[in-house]
């Protein structure tokens, strides 16, 4: 679906106080031009951008989320927070894709306080990209309410996601290439699915049940899952006491 010609995106920007925010300030002082789509939230470090911030911004129908931090190696904090932001961005994009949100709506960039023109270039490029994608949900071909439900399910699991990141997603090489290699390697996919995506799927199933759906078939159709996948997750949820299954009616209800 083509974006309306008068569409003006809303981009939530989380900017590092020491570098990217300074670059944005220099951009304004120098009168470099970029689209007025950005809504700035200044943070002390890009590593402070929690997964919850990203999911909540999209749940509130932001069309794009931008994270701007110091160049790697220039972070003012130890251990370097921008590596935390880099790891979070890899995880967030995979989760967004699983929910159905186009991961290109999230962008992470390094901009120093002296790079006003670079800030303008990045925002012009990202602004054009978001404008081409259209309003949140349009390029995805999904109902906004369904995307919001997925984001809410992900948001509820953020504490668990952070624990997994800390304990299981330890990147051996603290370089940008090291992070790309770790999150892009072939054996990372089954690890991510088992630890993150399966948990997210169960959270989304629980959310669907709360809306009044009461059978595996209805849940599978609503979420676009395979019926067998839903049945397997429901079996695990039942073992954990999270749902009750009425075998005679093949109906499922959230446990009290």
Q: Where do the protein language model's features map onto the residues?
A:
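Minor-groove-contacting beta-hairpin "wing" of winged helix-turn-helix DNA-binding domains
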Residues: 249-255
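Iron-sulfur-associated redox domains of electron-transfer enzymes in respiratory
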Residues: 1-222, 226-235, 256
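A short, conserved structural fragment
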Residues: 238-249
């Amino acid at each position: 679906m083509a974006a309306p010609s008068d569409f003006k995106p809303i981009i939530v920007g989380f900017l590092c106080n020491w570098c990217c925010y300074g670059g944005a300030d220099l951009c304004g002082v120098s009168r470099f031009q970029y689209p007025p789509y950005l809504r700035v939230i200044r943070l002390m470090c890009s590593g402070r951008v929690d997964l919850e911030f990203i999911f909540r911004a999209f749940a509130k129908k932001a069309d794009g989320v931008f994270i701007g931090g110091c160049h790697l190696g220039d972070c003012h904090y130890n251990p370097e927070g921008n590596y935390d932001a880099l790891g979070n961005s890899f995880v967030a994009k995979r989760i967004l894709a699983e929910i159905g949100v186009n991961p290109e709506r999230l962008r992470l960039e390094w901009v120093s306080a002296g790079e006003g023109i670079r800030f303008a270039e990045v925002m012009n490029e990202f602004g054009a990209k978001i404008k081409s994608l259209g309003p949140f949900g349009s390029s995805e071909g999904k109902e906004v309410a369904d995307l919001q439900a997925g984001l809410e399910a992900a948001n509820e699991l953020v504490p668990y996601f952070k624990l997994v990141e800390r304990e299981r997603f330890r990147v051996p090489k603290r370089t940008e290439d090291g992070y790309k290699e770790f999150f892009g390697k072939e054996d990372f996919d089954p690890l991510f699915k088992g630890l993150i995506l399966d948990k997210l799927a169960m959270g989304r199933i629980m959310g669907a049940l709360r809306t009044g759906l009461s059978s595996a078939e209805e849940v599978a159709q609503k979420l676009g899952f395979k019926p067998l996948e839903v049945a397997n997750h429901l079996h695990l949820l039942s073992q954990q006491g999270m749902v009750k299954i009425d075998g005679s009616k093949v109906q499922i209800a959230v446990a009290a």
